């Protein structure tokens, strides 16, 4: 249904017609592969603080809405993965069942409906999960494939998996909607298992060399500083750099 609200809707636009709820649910998908400066490095133009502010505003000012964070899991996602998971937990508390109110919707009948005795079916809005996550594994470009990860980076993922397990949903989940669901934990378990399978050593060397070349060119073109943003990857970067140095030395001899 529509109605005119000249005080609160499009006050200065000249168009005051407001369309009331015409859908049962709206699902907003957000691509976010990390947090803070690392997330901004991976997606040029992203303002992380503004994104989170807008996300909270969207959740606070709308009903019948859900947000799903998509972390296209690549090697650059690893350092901030635990912080990313903590962000999910925090939002699930902030907008979870403890802060939701169940209510009944009974649309007002039109004059025509009143005349013909037509009654709308009442709808009862129950509490529901508003924050979802997904962590699909990136396979291309090859140099960002997490299967190129070193044992140190793999250990970081293992630590994050334990973090998820220690924050798994509890018996009151249907009331609070807090914690991680079993299938969400299985997603990271699956990713970790695939990453541990590894790749052919020659392919890993090629991918790491291309990683070094790509990052250097990326920083040059966009005036960024990889090691300042990803200090946790200093060792990995230097391993990749060593491959380039060997090639350069071979050319000189």
Residue spans of the language-model regions?
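Generic preference for hydrophobic/aromatic residues in regular secondary structure cores
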Residues: 26, 65, 105, 111-122, ...
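Radical SAM/AdoMet-radical enzyme domain recognition
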Residues: 1-115, 128-136
């Amino acid at each position: 249904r529509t109605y005119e609200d000249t005080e609160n809707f499009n006050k200065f636009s000249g168009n005051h017609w407001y369309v009331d709820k015409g859908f049962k649910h709206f699902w907003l998908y957000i691509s976010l592969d990390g947090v803070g400066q690392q997330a901004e490095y991976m997606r040029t133009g992203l303002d992380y603080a503004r994104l989170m502010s807008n996300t909270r505003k969207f959740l606070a000012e709308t009903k019948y809405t859900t947000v799903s964070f998509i972390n296209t899991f690549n090697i650059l996602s690893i350092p901030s993965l635990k912080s990313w998971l903590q962000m999910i937990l925090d939002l699930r508390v902030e907008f979870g069942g403890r802060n939701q109110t169940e209510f009944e919707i009974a649309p007002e009948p039109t004059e025509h409906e009143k005349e013909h005795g037509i009654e709308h079916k009442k709808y009862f809005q129950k509490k529901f999960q508003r924050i979802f996550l997904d962590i699909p594994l990136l396979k291309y470009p090859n140099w960002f494939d997490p299967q190129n990860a070193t044992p140190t980076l793999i250990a970081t993922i293992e630590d994050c998996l334990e973090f998820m397990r220690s924050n798994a949903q509890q018996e009151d989940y249907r009331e609070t909607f807090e914690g991680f669901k079993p299938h969400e934990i299985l997603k990271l378990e699956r990713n970790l298992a695939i990453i541990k399978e590894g790749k052919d050593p020659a392919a890993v060397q090629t991918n790491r060399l291309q990683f070094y070349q790509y990052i250097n060119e990326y920083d040059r073109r966009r005036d960024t500083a990889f090691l300042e943003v990803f200090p946790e990857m200093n060792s990995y970067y230097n391993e990749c750099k060593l491959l380039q140095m060997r090639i350069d030395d071979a050319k000189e001899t």
